[in-house]
């Protein structure tokens, strides 16, 4: 073998071997235990970033480890290829989204191969191909027939100048990102899938997911937002309809002093006919899109509609206000307000001088002080007529029962979760397979017209979707009648909700899934991706699995047994202030830094001499220009070094700080491994190891080898603390580097140790391990080698360390056989120079001996 470690030479050779041998291609095999290891599929943006590299390295380490345990391991990869960025890039580069996307896929595929990930490339799929989305379209038509799909109008961002719908991220400060026109809210018909029909199951089955992070399960629980409460109907004077509200706090009902409705509510619209102030307010609300997250912090505004509702229990008239914090799409679009016991209602009532009536006593039984804020804690009722003196639960039930008996209340379970709106008014997505006949009938596209193919050879003007701009595209005939196709496309979360199942049978032509293959591989054993997908993707992913189960395609309830959310990758960030006060972010690669004695950055400048402000470590991002290109790092150090650093620098689920000094450290370690194998093999063949003829030192070294195997196995397999596994291997390597290699048995022991080290490192650094395994004459390819097993006998300690004290002060530490008697330990202690010195000429009055641990000689 060559003396120097040259990753640029070995890595491409090993990758070619894997390609030619199709090493990682698998098929169903009932005789073997399966393991399905899946990383979230990437969006083909053009280049891999470090976040991808971290995600996929973790997946590859787990997959390779499980393979070495003898399992049938599926690790597939594909491309989440539809989506808005492709449209923007196509307009910018004067091309169409399809060629841009396919070019990116080709480029990124090479990058993935360059990193040595062991994927089954025969299963690669791109979600923008008709071969893939045809089954999604077919499935949608089936869901429609089952009554799980419906159409209703829903508000979107509308640019009146471009006459087009904008995604939320295309609205900048209330204006269109392209033409700066003020964006309006417009109601348009859209398609929805009834995820709410599965709300209870999605909620309850979270309890089955023992190996999902609690944070993710909590986020999903809150997102589904199940609550138990009462729906209450109010009569409204001089208004044709009643108003219905939902509350989870009927115990506070006697303190309800006003109602609030959404600006889009029919009652507000009616009142606005004769109220210009209200009309202007409704207009303002219509054009400010409020994300639910912003609701809490925004200023609460409202206008009195002039209508009065009648409190069903007290008969009092209470005002009805239109307010910007009530959303039409949530609940009934109307809420009851109890300002004494809800902080938002309190702030609104204080601002507009509305009545604040306390009905719950403070914890000490006194009337609450509402001069500064509402009392939101539950407690005992007062000021509530017949319900005075009841605690929260009793009051909840008594008031709910009374309202029900009167016919104006109904107990209800409510969900925050809304049905999934899957319509997008974009081009680069899968066409929604619905048609409208000449007579207005809406129906699914017939099977013989599926897939509805998205034309790829299009011209993008950046304004209107090409399939909306071309009236001919939509024309078709159904049942002999002219019909128009739907020109909206699916939300791209549709494609990523079932791709994991299609990987099990990517070539299957008879339907969406081949149940036999799907049920062999599913559920996924471990799913790896970012926590930012906790609610949207991971909820739709679970929902789709249940839909496919109910269609008879899969027989499990949940798609993935374990979820691992990897931490973000951080890097140093620097900027200088430009002439106009703007921040110009400078890549850490271009920053020349000075550090203090602790290695902290104290000064920085760039090549042009700008003084740089160092803002610390932050997530690698385009906006801060602090991304590090993985390709540059692989070209500089090799893929194995980058992979090793990624797994060593931090626990998988914590943030990782990118430090090139750490990358250099990982590289030095691999050079040491190479050097040790080189020096070992240069001495020729090795005799067989005779474990019964080892010296004490050899036994001790062999014990370290097998203890390391046991620790690394536990760290990777059970604990998934990959960084501590690598640390243990590094510690063993330090011992091996110092071990004698003079005798035949020394070299035989070194051979056993190196074969173990190379196999333990293989999941992390597969190229160097593949090569060194061959140099060590390991059996077959390392890709088919079994994981090393710790020898229990070798790990048994036959000696132990005893601390020797004289009058309670430590004077020596001695190694004695495990079965040594107290006499033998005393005799051995007496041979130590320091112990002998303190025993000279004195009498030992007392001996305290803790077997195998401590010998304390009390002298006087």
Curated annotation (Swiss-Prot):
It comes from the Bacteria. This is Leucine--tRNA ligase. A motif ('KMSKS' region) lies at residues 619-623. One of its GO terms (biological process) is leucyl-tRNA aminoacylation. Belongs to the class-I aminoacyl-tRNA synthetase family. It holds the Pfam family Anticodon_1. It comes from Escherichia coli (strain SMS-3-5 / SECEC). InterPro entries: aa-tRNA-synth_I_CS (IPR001412), aa-tRNA-synth_Ia (IPR002300), Leu-tRNA-ligase (IPR002302), Leu_tRNA-synth_edit (IPR025709), M/V/L/I-tRNA-synth_anticd-bd (IPR013155), Methionyl/Leucyl_tRNA_Synth (IPR015413), Rossmann-like_a/b/a_fold (IPR014729), tRNAsynth_Ia_anticodon-bd (IPR009080). It is found in: Cytoplasm.
């Amino acid at each position: 073998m060559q003396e120097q470690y040259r990753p640029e030479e070995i890595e491409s050779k090993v990758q070619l071997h894997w390609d030619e041998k199709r090493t990682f291609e698998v098929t169903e095999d009932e005789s073997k235990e399966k393991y399905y290891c899946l990383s979230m599929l990437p969006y083909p943006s053009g280049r891999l970033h470090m976040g991808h590299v971290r995600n996929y390295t973790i997946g590859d380490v787990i997959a390779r480890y499980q393979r070495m345990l003898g399992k049938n391991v599926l690790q597939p990869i594909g491309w989440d290829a539809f989506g808005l960025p492709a449209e923007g890039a196509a307009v910018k580069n004067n091309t169409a989204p399809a060629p841009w996307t396919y070019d990116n896929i080709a480029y990124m595929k090479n990058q993935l191969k360059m990193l040595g990930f062991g994927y089954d490339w025969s299963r690669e799929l791109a979600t923008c191909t008709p071969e893939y989305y045809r089954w999604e379209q077919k499935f949608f038509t089936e869901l429609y027939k089952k009554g799980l799909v419906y159409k209703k109008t829903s508000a979107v961002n509308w640019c009146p100048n471009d006459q087009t719908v904008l995604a939320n991220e295309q609205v900048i400060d209330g204006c269109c990102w392209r033409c700066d026109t003020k964006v309006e809210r417009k109601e348009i018909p859209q398609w929805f899938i009834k995820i709410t029909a599965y709300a209870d199951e999605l909620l309850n089955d979270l309890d089955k997911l023992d190996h999902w992070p609690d944070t993710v399960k909590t986020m999903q629980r809150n997102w589904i937002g199940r609550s138990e409460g009462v729906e209450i109907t109010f009569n409204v004077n001089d208004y044709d309809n009643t108003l219905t509200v939902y509350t989870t706090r009927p115990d506070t009902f006697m303190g309800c002093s006003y109602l609030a409705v959404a600006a889009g509510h029919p009652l507000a619209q009616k009142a606005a006919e004769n109220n210009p102030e209200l009309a202007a307010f409704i207009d303002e609300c219509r054009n400010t899109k409020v994300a639910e997250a912003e609701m809490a912090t925004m200023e609460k505004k409202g206008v009195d509609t002039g209508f009065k509702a009648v409190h069903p229990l007290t008969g009092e008239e209470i005002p009805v206000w239109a307010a910007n914090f009530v959303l039409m799409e949530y609940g009934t679009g109307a809420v009851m307000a109890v300002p004494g016991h809800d902080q938002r209602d309190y702030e609104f009532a204080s601002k507009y001088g509305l009545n604040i009536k306390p009905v719950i006593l403070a914890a000490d039984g006194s009337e609450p002080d509402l001069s500064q804020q509402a009392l939101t804690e539950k407690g005992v009722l007062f000021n509530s007529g017949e319900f005075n003196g009841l605690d929260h639960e009793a009051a909840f039930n008594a008031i709910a029962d009374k309202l029900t008996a009167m016919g104006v209340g109904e107990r209800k379970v409510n969900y925050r979760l809304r049905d999934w709106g899957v319509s997008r008014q974009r081009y680069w997505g899968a066409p929604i397979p619905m048609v409208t006949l000449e007579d207005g009938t809406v129906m699914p596209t017939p099977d013989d017209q599926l897939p509805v193919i998205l034309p790829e050879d299009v011209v993008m003007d950046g304004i209107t979707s090409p399939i909306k701009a071309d009236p001919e595209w939509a024309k078709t005939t159904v049942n002999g009648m002219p019909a128009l196709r739907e020109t909206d496309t699916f939300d791209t979360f549709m494609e990523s909700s079932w791709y994991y199942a299609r990987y099990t049978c990517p070539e299957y032509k008879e339907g969406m899934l081949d149940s036999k293959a799907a049920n062999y591989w599913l559920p996924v054993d471990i799913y790896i991706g970012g926590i930012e997908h906790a609610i949207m993707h991971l909820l739709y992913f679970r929902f789709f699995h249940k839909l496919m189960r109910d269609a008879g395609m899969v027989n499990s309830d949940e798609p993935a047994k374990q979820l691992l959310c990897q931490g973000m990758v951080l890097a140093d960030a620097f900027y200088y202030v430009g002439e106009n006060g703007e921040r110009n972010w400078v890549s850490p690669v271009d920053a020349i830094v000075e550090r203090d004695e602790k290695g902290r950055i104290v000064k920085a400048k760039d090549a042009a001499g700008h003084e740089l402000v160092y803002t610390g470590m932050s997530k690698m991002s385009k906006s801060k220009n602090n991304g590090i290109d993985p390709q540059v790092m692989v070209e500089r150090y090799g893929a194995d070094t980058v992979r090793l650093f990624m797994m060593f620098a931090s626990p998988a689920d914590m943030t990782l700080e990118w430090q090139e000094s750490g990358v250099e450290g990982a590289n030095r370690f691999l050079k040491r491994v190479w050097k040790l194998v080189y020096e070992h093999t240069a001495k020729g063949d090795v005799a067989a190891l005779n474990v019964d003829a080892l010296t004490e030192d050899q036994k001790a070294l062999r014990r370290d080898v097998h203890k390391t195997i046991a620790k690394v196995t536990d760290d990777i397999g059970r604990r998934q603390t990959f960084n501590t596994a690598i640390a243990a291997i590094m510690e063993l390597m330090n011992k091996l580097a110092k071990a004698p290699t003079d005798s035949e048995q020394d070299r035989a022991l070194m051979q056993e140790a190196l074969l173990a080290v190379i196999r333990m490192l293989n999941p992390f650094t597969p190229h160097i391990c593949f090569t060194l395994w061959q140099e060590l004459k390991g059996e077959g390819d390392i890709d088919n080698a079994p994981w090393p097993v710790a020898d229990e006998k070798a790990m048994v300690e036959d000696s132990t360390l005893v601390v020797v004290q004289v009058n309670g002060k430590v004077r020596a530490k001695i190694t004695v056989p495990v079965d040594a008697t107290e006499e033998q330990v005393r005799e051995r202690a007496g041979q130590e120079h320091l112990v002998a010195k303190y025993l000279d000429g004195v009498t030992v009055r007392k001996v305290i001996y803790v077997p195998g641990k401590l010998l304390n000689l009390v002298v006087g």
